[in-house]
């Protein structure tokens, strides 16, 4: 199994803030927590960049990190400001999470609250070749629902 070294920037993690971990043996993502001193109120329509206290350098060009929302926050209208985050293998820095309140109510983020998840995925890079045409397929150029609904 591939291991990735995650650096902890904030010395309070493991003491005041819980150390990130997989919740179950079958968990694909690791919860990221708000590493903040005080509550943050997100007004409807507002975004805020929240520190996780973590930094990462994946350093393997075959891997990337994907930051995705937690379904429990989506229930309250809280989503990621950029909807999904991508951490390239050569990025070396802090993991920050942009939260956006799409709801109609003020939402309060508590210190140590789980605010997003990170999933590590394998990456395949593609090569582009200029061609005159493709080999014909049954589907052809039909898109936007042409493969059927059922």
UniProtKB/Swiss-Prot annotation:
State the PANTHER family in the record.
DEOXYURIDINE 5'-TRIPHOSPHATE NUCLEOTIDOHYDROLASE (PTHR11241:SF0)
Please list the GO biological process terms of this entry: dUMP biosynthetic process; dUTP catabolic process
Protein name as catalogued:
Deoxyuridine 5'-triphosphate nucleotidohydrolase
The source's superkingdom equals Bacteria
Residues binding substrate are 70-72, 82, 86-88, 96
Q: Name one Pfam family in it.
A: dUTPase
Species annotation = Baumannia cicadellinicola subsp. Homalodisca coagulata
InterPro entries to which the protein is assigned, alphabetical: dUTPase, dUTPase-like, dUTPase-like_sf, dUTPase_trimeric
Q: What does this protein do?
A: This enzyme is involved in nucleotide metabolism: it produces dUMP, the immediate precursor of thymidine nucleotides and it decreases the intracellular concentration of dUTP so that uracil cannot be incorporated into DNA.
Taking the record's annotation, the residue ranges forming a coiled coil are none
């Amino acid at each position: 199994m591939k291991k990735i070294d995650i650096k902890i920037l904030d010395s309070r993690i493991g003491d005041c803030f819980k150390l990130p971990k997989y919740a179950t043996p079958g968990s694909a993502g690791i919860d990221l927590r708000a590493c903040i001193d005080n509550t943050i109120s997100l007004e409807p329509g507002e975004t805020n960049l929240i520190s996780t206290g973590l930094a990462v350098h994946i350093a393997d060009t075959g891997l990337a990190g994907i930051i995705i929302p937690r379904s429990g926050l989506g229930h309250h209208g809280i989503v990621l400001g950029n909807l999904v985050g991508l951490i390239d293998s050569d990025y070396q820095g802090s993991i920050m999470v942009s939260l956006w309140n799409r709801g109609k109510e003020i939402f309060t983020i508590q210190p140590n609250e789980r605010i997003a998840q990170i999933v590590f995925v394998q990456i395949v890079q593609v090569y582009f070749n200029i061609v005159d045409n493709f080999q014909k397929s049954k589907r052809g150029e039909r898109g936007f629902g042409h493969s059927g609904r059922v």
